[in-house]
Amino acid sequence: MSTPKDMRYSKEHEWVKVEDGKARIGITHFAQAELGDIVFVELPEVGAEIKADEPFGSVESVKTVSELYAPINGTVTEVNEDLDDSPEFVNESPYEKAWMIVVEPADAEEIENLMTSEQYDEMTQED
């Protein structure tokens, strides 16, 4: 699966897509493939403050539990509740159905400091 070019990426394998000034966040195809079959997703409540490089939730796979790290600072405005009943969306559709949270960014410039798809692909090929 190719890395979408209309998103930015963190070193912790989260993606950010800006829509109407808000940041939609999820994990990358690379991350879900490394984790294996996802069986549970824990996400913050709407209104929660997230801080860049700090955990905001977790994903549990058949292999392990892995923390989700916020790529930016901001306030959660929406949570993907579909993942409560269908955590497999993370494996099946990491960039579409499996977005995790929508955030009102504290500073939109932080998003520009994240990696482009080309930079992210380069990083994951080195792993």
Swiss-Prot record:
Sorted UniProt keywords: Lipoyl
Residue numbers carrying N6-lipoyllysine: 63
Membrane-crossing segments per the record: none
Cofactor(s) needed: (R)-lipoate
Pfam families recorded: GCV_H
Lipoyl-binding domain span: 22-104
Subunit structure, interactors included: The glycine cleavage system is composed of four proteins: P, T, L and H.
Function: The glycine cleavage system catalyzes the degradation of glycine. The H protein shuttles the methylamine group of glycine from the P protein to the T protein. Is also involved in protein lipoylation via its role as an octanoyl/lipoyl carrier protein intermediate.
HAMAP family: GcvH
Protein name: Glycine cleavage system H protein
